[in-house]
């Protein structure tokens, strides 16, 4: 009996860590992928959502929704943009990803962005997701990771590329947010790598490398990519009530070999819709949009009680009534 229980426990443990992501290309429209999956906020939404991928050129589709239960992959769900067939991103890491044909073009804005960093690229098989939005707060951020077949084999000298191009429509100024933290380097297998998986070159920003999914780790990989970065954060400070455009683009370098992908986490795409307070949440449908107000009520009689309100432990001068109208996030008490 003890042996049977042990075998059962090992089976359950193995299955827990070998779950692959699920990719869905049919349940969401392009606009729904952005507004319902990435942003998911009643406060602000994206407009003019457009995509471009291989299926526009007689090749494979590189855009889809994914879900995950594998603890080795740090996202539960989100949107995937791939330089190959997005459905082939499903793990385990068992096959080489070389999808796409010669009719699927690259992206000139990605090439121009890399050129500004001294990187020459002849791109192909580009997948693009872009939209307009007008923020109501200065905060812009989202969580993502980069995965690629090039990790291990080609991480020393050859890399696909991607960019998150944020443009202030009024000024025309564009900033690439897909950079290695605390640097100006575009993220790729060359700029984030660990020499343990290819000793031909030293590590580069290895603290941001997440996992190598080859060799003994292949069978338990959530995706079919050789490696991936850690969960990273793209962020910027915006001017409220100013129109912006964001272009998310990824492409193969030179040919369709060794595909790569960007995974963007659900509900993390903050395009300036900050809510008021942690307990007033989008998830509970109680969110208060930035710039709006909310009234805290004690339901106590002012004839029987005196009131002193605090914000973050500090007494608020003049706040002595039974109710308090607030416009800023914080921890309030009475």
Name what the model sees in each region.
Residues 320-333:
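Solvent-exposed segments in extracellular or luminal domains encompassing
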Residues 223-227, 313-320:
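Short beta-strand segments within Ig-like beta-sandwich modules, predominantly Fibronectin type-III
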Residues 272-285:
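Proline-enriched interdomain boundary motifs that mark the N-terminal boundary
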Residues 19-275:
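Aromatic (Trp/Tyr/Phe) and Gly/Pro-enriched flexible surface segments
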Residues 300-313:
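Solvent-exposed loop segments of extracellular immunoglobulin-like
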Residues 1-23:
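Bacterial Sec-dependent N-terminal signal peptides
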Residues 287-302:
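A short beta-strand segment in extracellular, disulfide-stabilized domains
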């Amino acid at each position: 009996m003890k042996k049977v229980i042990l075998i059962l426990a090992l089976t359950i443990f193995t299955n827990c860590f070998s779950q692959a992501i699920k990719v869905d290309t049919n349940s969401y429209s392009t606009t729904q992928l952005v507004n319902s999956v990435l942003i998911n906020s009643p406060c602000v939404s994206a407009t003019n959502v457009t995509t471009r991928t291989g299926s526009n050129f007689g090749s494979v589709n590189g855009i889809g929704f994914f879900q995950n239960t594998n603890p080795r992959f740090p996202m539960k769900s989100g949107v995937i943009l791939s330089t190959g067939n997005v459905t082939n991103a499903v793990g385990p890491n068992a096959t080489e990803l070389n999808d796409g044909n010669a009719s699927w073009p690259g992206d000139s804005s990605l090439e121009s962005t890399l050129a500004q960093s001294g990187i020459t690229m002849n791109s192909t098989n580009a997948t693009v997701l872009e939209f307009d939005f007008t923020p109501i707060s200065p905060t812009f951020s989202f969580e993502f990771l980069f995965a690629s077949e090039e990790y291990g084999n080609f991480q020393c000298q050859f890399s696909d590329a991607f960019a998150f191009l944020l443009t202030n429509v009024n000024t025309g100024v564009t900033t690439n947010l897909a950079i290695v933290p605390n640097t100006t380097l575009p993220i790729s297998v060359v700029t984030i790598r660990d020499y343990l998986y290819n000793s031909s070159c030293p590590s580069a920003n290895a603290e941001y490398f997440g996992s190598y999914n080859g060799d003994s780790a292949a069978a338990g990989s959530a995706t079919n990519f050789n490696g991936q970065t850690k969960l990273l954060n793209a962020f910027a400070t915006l001017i409220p009530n100013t129109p912006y455009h964001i272009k998310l683009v990824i492409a193969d370098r030179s040919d369709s070999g060794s595909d790569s992908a960007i995974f963007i986490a659900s509900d993390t795409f903050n395009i300036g819709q900050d809510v008021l307070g942690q307990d007033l949440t989008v998830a509970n449908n109680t969110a208060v949009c930035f710039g709006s107000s909310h009234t805290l009520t004690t339901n106590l009689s002012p004839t029987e009680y005196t009131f002193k309100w605090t914000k973050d432990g500090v007494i608020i001068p003049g706040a002595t009534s039974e109710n308090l109208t607030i416009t800023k996030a914080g921890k309030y008490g009475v």
